[in-house]
Amino acid sequence: MKEIGGYIQLDTYTGEMLHEEGILLNSGRNCLLYLAEAKHINKIRLPYFLCDSVYNSCVNAGIKVKFYHVDMNFMPEEPQKLDDDEWLYIVDYYGQLSDECIASLKQKYNRIVLDYTQSYFRKPLNGVDTMYTCRKFFGVTDGAVLYSDTKLERELETDESYSRMEFLLGRYERAASDFYPEYVNNNKLFAKMPVRKMSRLTYNLLHAINYDMTGKRRENNFNVLASLLGALNGIDVNSVIGPFAYPLYVEDGAELRKYLISNKIYIPLLWPNVIKDMPDDSVEYLSLIHISEPTRH
């Protein structure tokens, strides 16, 4: 029975939500696990240049994993052949993959999973299993979207987010550094989080966002950085819709990151596991060390 009265709750927002027509889940890695269960994926080829949480999720689910490399422009070095029941996991790093490249990969391998974690404002391509992560772009603690022609037959529980909101609410009124430990703890929770439907709280907050304004602001910031830093950049970077970040490749990228952090400009180190796992002359290692992301917002 629904409770009535007592005290006021959070307002219900009614704006349009980007990707509302997809399968709404609680995390990006759980999009992959949902897809693996629905499509009976037992083998997958992952890029070395990737968060180890994806690999760990696959291993824990009993999925056999092989790896492949990417080049300096984040393009996949395509395997000559996949096993008959193997899937290829493609990451659209910084939104740099073209629709033509994705379509070509789909035609060549058929069984591909497209990771749009860094490309929330891109539309999915028809017939390509595609996943998006909400918290990489917006002020929510969780949430992800999957596009697929196959759905699970079993009913999923709905996630709850209220207990994970402190670092977001705290940063709104105080310094980000005051709540960084809570942010880190929230990230750790995803490792053991089962596949669930997106929480009602996250779903509601995603209806409060002006996606057109947010996307254009990101594009403006990206274009300003490209005009100022493009001549210094060691890689070619294409303009994209609603970009995740501007990737700047410079030889002293690690020192630049330290300098920016010392001036309270926080440059994340994506996937530090790559530094531990890859040789220091590999493309993946060099990309992680030398790429700074001057702004995301």
Feature roles, as predicted:
Residues 4-22, 26, 33-107, 111, ...:
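PLP-dependent aminotransferase-like
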Residues 127-169, 174:
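Active-site PLP attachment segment
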Residues 147, 247-251:
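Short hydrophobic/aromatic beta-strand micro-patches
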Residues 197-226, 235-248:
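Conserved glycine-rich beta-strand-loop-beta hairpin in the small C-terminal domain of fold type I
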Residues 238-239, 253-287:
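Conserved PLP cofactor-binding pocket of PLP-dependent enzymes
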Residues 289-295:
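Conserved small/polar residues in nucleotide/adenosyl-binding loops
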